Design a protein with these regions (language model features):
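Short, basic, low-complexity termini and linkers enriched in Ser/Thr/Gly/Pro
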Residues: 1-2, 131-141, 237
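Short helix-capping segments at alpha-helix termini
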Residues: 73-78, 138-141
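Generic enzyme active-site microenvironment
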Residues: 8, 42, 81, 144, ...
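Catalytic domains of carbohydrate-active enzymes, especially glycoside hydrolases
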Residues: 30-46, 211
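N-terminal amphipathic alpha-helix/helix-capping segment at the start of soluble metabolic enzymes
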Residues: 1-16, 30, 237
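Residue-level signal for inorganic ion chemistry
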Residues: 39, 101, 145
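Short beta-strands and strand-loop turn motifs
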Residues: 12, 43-47, 124-127, 144-149
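Active-site-adjacent loop and "lid" segments of alpha/beta metabolic enzymes
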Residues: 17-26, 30, 50-71, 79, ...
Length: 237
């Protein structure tokens, strides 16, 4: 089992779980350093909240938020991902040292694919956008399929998506991002505040890894890394 951990840094004032905590560049850079120390293999920088009801922003504002952070994090010796659906932001991020573009919407995928030409960058995209990719087999080594847990989905749909990971993994690398989304509360019936469902979040990450996910995108890096290390040790003994 080989599953990397992607740590989330939201450089936003309004993300659903930690909006505003890391909005200043120095705070976001410190957050990234802490996640790396906790064992993150990849840092995912986001400048726009994708929570339901969030106010969209233009690519210029998004880039003004993440650009100064990306330049510093790219020098920390870790893979850097940029969470954006704006091709303009993605293009600038690649030039600034990003290794992965994480796009949660299908519509921009054709433009994002153009950015792969002449660059070694990789692309995360919704599995629903697979039909938009011409000759996907030639690009598979540079793509990650995202089942899109928690994006306008019911509890039953989220569970089915998680159970579909083995089949998705036959098509290519799978990235699962279910951290701090409502699925844990939906599955347990708990009404605790955001960030208090660490056990459930880690359980989903471990499940995803066991089912064949190549990357889990999480807020609670330290706990997830520890759980995956224990799982690997148990499998090896």
């Amino acid at each position: 089992m080989s599953c990397r951990v992607m740590g989330i840094v939201n450089v936003t004032p309004d993300s659903f779980s930690d909006g505003g905590q890391f909005f200043k560049p120095e705070e976001a850079i410190r957050r990234a350093k802490n996640l790396i120390a906790d064992g993150a293999d990849i840092i995912d920088l986001g400048g726009e909240s994708t929570r339901p009801g969030a106010t969209p922003i233009g690519w210029e504002e998004e880039w003004n938020r993440i650009g100064p952070v990306l330049e510093k994090v790219a020098d920390l010796g870790v893979l850097v991902s940029v969470d954006t659906y704006h091709p303009e932001t993605a293009e600038r991020a690649i030039k600034a040292g990003a290794h992965i573009i994480n796009c949660v919407y299908a519509e921009p995928i054709p433009e994002m694919l153009k950015l792969l030409k002449g660059n070694e960058v990789e692309l995360v995209f919704p599995v629903s956008a697979l039909p938009l990719i011409p000759n996907p087999q030639s690009l598979i080594p540079r793509l990650y399929l995202d089942p899109m847990i928690g994006f306008n989905t019911t509890r039953e749909e989220d569970v089915e998506l998680l159970r579909s990971i083995p089949e998705l993994a036959k098509k290519g690398r799978v990235l699962v991002g279910a951290s701090r989304k409502r699925i844990v509360k939906k599955m347990t019936g708990e009404k605790s505040s955001v960030g208090k469902n660490i056990g459930g979040n880690v359980a989903i990450a471990v499940w995803a890894a066991m089912q064949g996910a190549s990357v889990v995108r999480v807020h609670d890096v330290k706990e997830t890394v520890q759980a995956l290390r224990v799982l690997r040790a148990l499998r090896e003994e």
